[in-house]
Amino acid sequence: MNRRSFLKTIAGFTVGVAGAHLALPITAKCKMLAPVTEIVGKTFLDRRIKNNIAKLKQANPWLMIGETHCHSIYSDGTYTVDQIMNRAANLGLDFLIITEHVTPKYFPLEDSLTSIRERWRCCQEWKDPNLALIDVYPAFEVSTEQGHLILVMDQDYLKPHNLSDLRTQFSPCEKKMVSMEKAAKMVEPFGGVSIIPHPDIARSYPFGVPISFIKQNLTGLVDAIEDISTGHGFDENYSEELGMASIGSSDDHFNLIIGTTVTGYDSRRHKNFLSAVKARDTQAIKVNDSLDDLMGMARMIL
């Protein structure tokens, strides 16, 4: 199926969901779209992403690439942790950061901790001899007073006996929205980094922190910022101006667009993603633009 035929086939369904925009909450619309995304992934997108990633790695053998922003059923995603891990590994990604929401009244911290526990379990039970285990990290996407902030911790905090430390540290974030400055500092004891997702994108609630606020309050405090996002349709160079690490991601909720935009680092210079971010030595990379037109339609209804 070519790109034009694919878009024509699903356009009617997408418009139908758009017609229900006011009547349905986002979780219901996500469930309606899930069957379509399953078809898209299997018949149209997976091969394209996988081939492009393989070419990218062939040209840059030391490059490690991964998804740094996506969601599972433990927040507002539609797929399980093991499904996301398996697809990411099949696509050829080296690392994966699932970023469940922590939002007062909506997304409790305990669900995010369960998601982290699932990542650990999947790693321990990985049995496919033909598929290398993908590197995963513990992480949250915290709702703050100024907007969302992704916090990524050292991999040691995937281990179940360390989850109580995360629970103690981050429990204030599910009781009320803290300032972004406070949230950024909370990750430091865990050897982690902070990432500003979808900057400067306004919603009716704190979502994308304004660039003006970042310049005045967050430079030197937050480690990284999304420069390219498939899910939100922007391609910028915020990181250079702000002195932060450059991040590329999808903000995938359907296990569909993972791998279309990635973050890369040189494995000769850094042992892992956290090391590269702290050194401000990462790059945002657009891998596949096949669904850019579709994502434009999706942003109107989700």
Which positions does each model-derived feature cover?
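C-terminal segment of N-terminal export signals and the immediately downstream linker at the start
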Residues: 1, 22-54
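Binuclear metal-dependent phosphoesterase catalytic core
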Residues: 252-302
